[in-house]
Every structure is written in structure tokens, then in C-alpha cells.
Regions:
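Internal helix-turn-beta structural module
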Residues: 140-205
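Residue-level signal for secondary-structure boundary elements
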Residues: 40-47, 85, 183, 192-196
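Short, mixed-charge aromatic SLiMs
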Residues: 2-11, 101-102, 154-157, 200-205
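Glycine-rich anion/phosphate-binding loop at the beta-strand->alpha-helix junction
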Residues: 42-154
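Glycine-rich and small/hydrophobic secondary-structure elements
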Residues: 17-23, 129, 178, 183
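Alpha/propeptide regions of enzymes that mature by internal proteolysis
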Residues: 31, 74, 173-175
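Beta-strand segments within the central parallel beta-sheet cores of soluble alpha/beta enzyme folds
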Residues: 1-4, 51, 88-91, 197-202
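Glycine-rich, mobile lid/loop segments that gate access to catalytic sites or pores
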Residues: 1-65
Length: 205
């Protein structure tokens, strides 16, 4: 949803497969092209904010304490190179809202909101699992920086070779694969442990 200073005004997941940046807002492609041209000329890099949404996830996946679904998802995403933070649900506004505002009330036709991001108490609640994560700008860039040599003397360093101005672009299919693996693991575990348990929701989505 964001690369460097360019953020999406609207999110259309299908648009992500229609451009080389995996960006979900096609109206921002010109801005991205300009930014990357400047980054390449400057020998610099930027970070990115990415999102993964799991739709139609069964209710009941996960554990209440050990092997929480959100903990396993966070571990999988944090295992991707350059990832520095992971959030699930409406994490950005969690400090600005009261409990009465952020709770996901249940109606006869389903949840009224999805601030929890599809996971409550470490267990999937049947709603979409919304996961966001941030990737840092890579430090392997052509622009000169400071370091020390083996004797502790301050020297300049310049990385040569081919380096991406944003490694976040390459992380999109990796994140999808990581999330799929975690969901599949929990599906198999749930089938083994709770195969005969009625897990139907009391409402239709």
C-alpha cells in the first residue's frame, strides 16, 4: 500500500498483478516511475508497506496461548529479509480508539467491523485476516556511507554491483507463500485435533 513516499489512495488487490511494482493503485504508477528513476540516479533505496489478506479462512484455527495463529503469522513474516514490523487488523488506530469503538460487534449477518483483523485470542474468527508489514530500505546501496576498517579507523564505504532500490517489491509473492504455509499448517493441525467439532458460524456472512 506504500512504497517510499508514494502511498495508495485506494486499494484494489487485483491491480497488484498488473504492474511491475505489485502496487494496488494504478493511478500512482507515474509517481512510482519518477521516484525510482531518481533513486537509481542517486544510488539510494526506500522501504515499503505491504499487506496480505486471507479471505474465507475457517473459524477456529490457532491456539489460545502457545502457537497462536497471529504469532505464527508474525513469525513467518518476520522471517522474510528486511522486514522490521508486522501488524494485524486496525493496529494503526489502536491507541486512538476506546474499547467500545474498536470491538468487533457481532450482528445477525456477521461482524459489524474487523478491527481485530480476523483473529481474536490467537484463534481465527472466520473474518478476513488482514496483515500489514514494513520492509526497511536496503543499506546495500551505491551511495557512499561511513564505516570502520579492521583497525577501527573511520572510512568511506560504497557498495558496487546490482542492488534493488526497493526490496519490498520482491517480497509480495514471498509473503503470500509464507502466509499460505502457516494457514495450511493450522488447517492440518485443526483437522487432526478438532475434526469432529462443529465449527460453523451462527450467522451467514
Amino acid at each position: 500500500s506504500q512504497i517510499g513516499h508514494v502511498s495508495a489512495d485506494s486499494i484494489n488487490p487485483s491491480s497488484a498483478n498488473e504492474n511491475k511494482y505489485f502496487f494496488a493503485d494504478l493511478s500512482k504508477l507515474d509517481d512510482l516511475n519518477k521516484m525510482f528513476e531518481e533513486l537509481i540516479a542517486e544510488g539510494n533505496s526506500v522501504g515499503a508497506k505491504l499487506g496480505v489478506c486471507v479471505e474465507n479462512c475457517p473459524v477456529g484455527l490457532g491456539e489460545p496461548v502457545f502457537d497462536k495463529l497471529n504469532a505464527d503469522l508474525a513469525k513467518a513474516i518476520m522471517s522474510i529479509n528486511a522486514v522490521k514490523s508486522v501488524s494485524i487488523g486496525n493496529a494503526e488506530n489502536i491507541l486512538n480508539l476506546k474499547g467500545s469503538e474498536i470491538r468487533d460487534e457481532i450482528r445477525s449477518d456477521g461482524f459489524a467491523s474487523n478491527n481485530a483483523g480476523g483473529i481474536l485470542g490467537g484463534i481465527s474468527n472466520g473474518d478476513n485476516i488482514d496483515l500489514d508489514f514494513l520492509i526497511k530500505p536496503t543499506s546495500s546501496i551505491k551511495k557512499k556511507g561511513k564505516t570502520v576498517d579492521k583497525d577501527g579507523n573511520e572510512v568511506d564505504i560504497e557498495v558496487t554491483g546490482r542492488h534493488d532500490p526497493c526490496v519490498g517489491i520482491r517480497a509480495v509473492p514471498i509473503a503470500e507463500a509464507m502466509v499460505n504455509l502457516v494457514i495450511m499448517d493450522h488447517l492440518l493441525r485443526n483437522r487432526a485435533q478438532c475434526g469432529e467439532v462443529d465449527q460453523q458460524l451462527p450467522f451467514t456472512k
